[in-house]
Amino acid sequence: MPSLRRFLELVVVGIVVCGVNGGSDGLEVAVARRQLHQPFFPDQSSSPPTPAPPGPAPPFFPALPVPPPPPATAGQEQPTYPALVLPNTGAGGAAATAAPDGGGGGGGGARKSKSSASKLVPAIVLPLLTVAVLGLSIAFFFTHRRGNAARGGGGGGGCVGGGDAKFLHPERASLFARDEFGGSGGAAAPPAAAMDYRYVGNAGIGRMDEKSSETTSSGDEASRSTGGSPELRPLPPLLARQCGPMGARSPGSGVGGFASPSSGDEEFYSPQGSSKMSTSHRTLAAAVEAAVAARDRSKSPSPGSIVSTPSYPSSPGATMSPAPASPPLFSSPGQSGRRSVKSRSDSVRTFGQPPAPPPPPPFAPTLPPPPPPRRKPPSPSPPSSPLIENTSALRSTTTTDTTIPRNPFVQPPPPPTHTHGPPPPPPPPPPPPVGYWESRVRKPGTGTSKETRSPALSPPPQAASFKSGLPTDAFPGRLADNADHAAAAAAGGGGDKSEETTPRPKLKPLHWDKVRASSDRVMVWDQLKSSSFQVNEEMIETLFICNPANSAPPKEPATRRPVLPTPKTDNKVLDPKKSQNIAILLRALNVSKEQVCDALCEGNTENFGAELLETLLKMAPTKEEEIKLREFKEETSPIKLGPAEKFLKAVLDIPFAFKRVDAMLYIANFESEVNYLKKSFETLETACDELRNSRLFLKLLEAVLKTGNRMNVGTNRGDAHAFKLDTLLKLVDVKGTDGKTTLLHFVVQEIIRTEGSHLSASNQSTPRTQANPLRDELECKKLGLQVVAGLGNELSNVKKAAAMDSDVLSSYVSKLAGGIEKITEVLRLNEEVKSREDAWRFHDSMQKFLKRADDDIIRVQAQESVALSLVKEITEYFHGDSAKEEAHPFRIFMVVRDFLSVLDQVCKEVGRINDRTIASSVRHFPVPVNPMMPQLFPRIHALRAGISDDESSATSASSP
C-alpha cells in the first residue's frame, strides 16, 4: 500500500497544478471578454474593489473521508473496506470556481488581448485531461484493491493476528490508532501497508484491517484490569493453518471454538473469528468431516458431553455476563470485501444468542469478554489423548477455516513466513482466567481422560509436549490410529504398576485382641499353613465393604438410612416421652384400665399390691394435662389418643382418682410399716437388757478398769472408778514391747484363764493329772477362750440396735400417724359424691380400715416411747451424767458393736497361739494311752530310757 499511496499523491498534485494553470488562462479570457462587454453606466466609485479573502489552502495530502457502511441486506454482502470517495479538488474544482468579480478593468487595460483560438484550446483540453487522469486513478485504485482482496482470500479471516494490525497493549493500541489516523475527532484513513502477524494460539496468516483490530470498550476494560506487558517480542510463525469462522464446529473434532468431547478435563482458550470459505475448501472440509464423524461413531463417543472450551461471539450482546479477568481478544477481517456485519450477527445467532445491536463504527469493532470456562463432567467414553484429538481435528479441516484450541501459554511451532520485513514483536500472552489452575488439568499425551485429580496434585500442562512438531500426515485416521496404538502400548507397559498401586477397598473392621507370637513355646497358630485357606476377595468385598463418612457419597448409597415413620396425629395431649413411659409401665403391670377403675371405685387393695399403686401414682398428670384430658372430645377432635392418654382419661373420669390411689397405697403399706416399727422397738428394748445383764461383758469391763488403773499409777488418770465405753476401742492401740501383743490381748488372756479355771473346776468328770500340769492349763485356756468368743452372740441384739437410726424411726411413726389424715380427707370428699353407686362401697372399706389403724398407731407410739426411755437409761447406766452430752441416742450400741468386732479378731489370734503351745507340749511330753498296760517290748523301752538319761546327764554337765 505505500506504493499506491505515493501514486495517488502524485496524481492529486498534478491535478491541482493543472487546475491552477487552467484557471489562470480562463481568467484571462474572461477578463478579455468582459472588457468587450463593459456596462454602459460604470460604477461611480473610483475606489479599487476589495479583493476577496483567499479560501483555505487545500492540504498537501488531502484526507479521504470514509462514509458509513450501508445497511446490510440478505442478498447483498457489504465489503469490509468501503469505497473511497475522492474530494472535489484539482482541475475540476478549478474549472468550477468562478472568477473573482470586481474591477479588473485596470488590469485588462494593461494586458494585451490574445487571439481567441489560442486561448479556447487549453480551456477545453485541460479539463478533459483532468477527468481522464482522475478516471484512470480511480480505475487503478479499484483494480489494485481487487487484486489485494483476491490475494488475501485465503488469509486468516477472523483469526487473531492474521492481518496487519499492530498488536500493542490495548491502551497503547488505541492511542496509536488515534495518532496515525488523524485523531479521534476527524475521519481517519486506514493504513495502506499490511503486515502479517501471528498471535499465540492462532494457526493462520491473514490480512487484517486496522478498523477491526481495535478492541471493544469491554475488552479495553478487561485488558486494563488484567494488565499486559509493554514488551513486544516476535514469535515464530505457525504452520499454514487458518482459523475457521466463528461458530464453525466440525462434528467430533472439537475445533472452531468448541473443545473436543474427549478432551477430558483440560481446558483450552481459542480466539474466535469469522471468515468466508471458498467452494472448493467447503467441499473438501465436508468430505473430511464426514470421514471423521464416521470414525468417531465407530468408536462410540460419549453422548451429551459438555463443551469445556468457551466460545467468544463477536457481538457485544452475545455475552450477558463477562468475566472480569479474561484476556481481550482481537479479530481482523481476512477477506476484505467479503466479511460483513451481517455475517457476524448471523454467526452469533447460530449459538442461540439474542440479536446483535446496530453495528459499531468501522474503526471500533467491539468484542465481549469471554465467559468463564465450564468444566466437563466425567463421561463413560473411552479415554483419549487431547493431543491426538486436536491433531485429528487439524487434519479434518482445511487450512483456511480451522480453529485449533491451544494452550495460551505454549508457543506453537514456526510456520513459513512471507512478511515484507521483520515483524514487530506481538504482545505477551494474556494471563489465565480466574480459577484456571484450580480446575482439573491433566497432562497432555496421557491416555487417561477419566482420571480425576485433585487441584493441588494436578500439574500444569507441560510446554515441551506441545513444542514437538506434529507429523504432517494427509490422512487424519492414520494419525489417530498411531496415537491409539501408542496409548495402548503405554497403558500395557504401566499396567502392572497401576495394579500394584491400586488401593484395596476398605472393609468393615473385626475387633479382636491380637496375641503376640511367642518364640519359646509351641502355639496352635504355628500349626496353620498359609495354603490351607484362601480368602475370596470378591465375595468379602461385596459383603463387608465399608463406606467411610469422608468419601464422596455414591449416586445410590449401598446402606440407606432408616426411614423414620411419619409422626401420627396421636400423643398430642401428653408429653411424648411421658406417654411412652406410661405405655411401657402399663404393659409391665399387665392390667387393664377396667380392672384399675373398678378397684379405685371400690377401694379394694387386696387384688393390687403396693407396687401397682405406686406405679399408678407416678402416672399422675399435671394440672394442665388433666384439664386437656378432661376437655378432650374424641368424637369431634381430629387427634387420636394413644394408649397412655386413653388410660389416664378413663382414670380421671373417677372422682378424685389419684387421691384414692394415694389413700389405697397407704392402706397397702400400713401393715408392713407397723410390723417394722414394732420389731425395731422390741430390738432396742432387748439390746438394753443384754447390756445390763451380760455377766461376761461386766467382767470384761472390770478387767479393763483394773488394768488401766495399774498402768495409770502415779498419774492423775489413776484410781478411776468408771470409764466411757469408747475406751474399749483404744485398747488395741496400746502395744507391748514385742510390737505384736496389745493391751486387749492381755485382757483377753487373763479373762480366758479365769473363765477356763472356773469351767474346769465345775467340770470334775475329767481327772487331773499331776504329771501334765501344762496340758491341763492349756485345756483351761481353750475353754475360757470359747466363753469370751461367745460374747458377740450374747450381745446380738446390740449389734442390730446399732444399725438403727432414731430419727428414721421417729419419722416413720409420724408418717404412719399422718396417713390417717389422708383417709379422713378421702372420706370427706366421698361424702360429696354419694350419689354414685360405688361411693358407698368405697366409704365402707375406708371406715373399716380407719378403726383398725387407729388402734395400731396408738400401740406403736406407746412402744416408741418405751424403747427410747430404755435407751436413755442404759446410756446413763454406763456413762452416768455424761449421757446428756451424747448427740446420737443410739451411739452406745454402735460403740459396743465396734468393740465386739475387735474382740472377735483378738480371740482368733489368741486361739492360734494356744494351739501352737499345745502342739509343742505334746512333742516334748508324750503321754501313753494307758499307763497301766504292760509294754510289748520292755527291753527296747529300757534301752531308750538309758539313752535319754545319758543325753540328759551330758547336757547338764556341759551347761555350766
From Swiss-Prot:
Bias kind Polar residues: ranges: 214-228, 271-282, 300-318, 387-396
Membrane-topology annotation of the record: Single-pass membrane protein
Domain of life, per lineage: Eukaryota
Annotated segments matching region Disordered: 39-114, 208-510, 550-573
InterPro entries: FH2_Formin (IPR015425), FH2_Formin_sf (IPR042201), Formin-like_plant (IPR027643)
SUPFAM superfamilies named in the record: Formin homology 2 domain (FH2 domain)
Stretches of the chain forming a coiled coil according to its record: none
Family matches, as Pfam families: FH2
Signal peptide feature range: 1-22
Keyword terms: Membrane, Signal, Transmembrane, Transmembrane helix
Residue stretches of biased makeup (Pro residues): 48-72, 354-385, 410-434
Domain annotation FH2: ranges: 497-929
Any GO BP annotation: actin cytoskeleton organization
Family note: Belongs to the formin-like family. Class-I subfamily.
Name of the protein: Formin-like protein 1
